[in-house]
């Protein structure tokens, strides 16, 4: 989808910037241990997620200045719907191997 600028990576917290190109997207994935909060710095995005309590898929457009919180065990995908964009991510730490792909971005 672009690249990641990881500026801090610790056991209890982490921070990175996700940089996207036009119409780039992430895999539909989830984490069992990692919670994430995103702040849209630049560009417009669509976040899609599955609510595992009702099995339904939801989506929300994210514009600059918007914050979105992604809880653990919540499958999600981010798509850039503008020419380019970037999102700041804060999380509750690095947990190796804690990303599980539901659908590859090529099939979304």
Map each language-model feature to its residues:
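A short glycine-rich, His/Asp/Glu-containing loop-to-beta-strand
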Residues: 1-34
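Conserved hydrophobic/aromatic beta-strand scaffold that supports enzyme active sites
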Residues: 15-19, 37, 59, 67-69
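Glycine- and acidic-residue-biased ligand/ion/polar-headgroup-sensing regions
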Residues: 22, 32-52
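Residue-level marker of beta-strand positions
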Residues: 25, 67-69, 75, 86
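Short, surface-exposed beta-strand-loop junctions and turns on beta-sheet-rich folds
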Residues: 34, 53-55, 93-96
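Short acidic-glycine-tyrosine-enriched beta hairpin
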Residues: 51-73
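Double-stranded beta-helix
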Residues: 60, 77-108
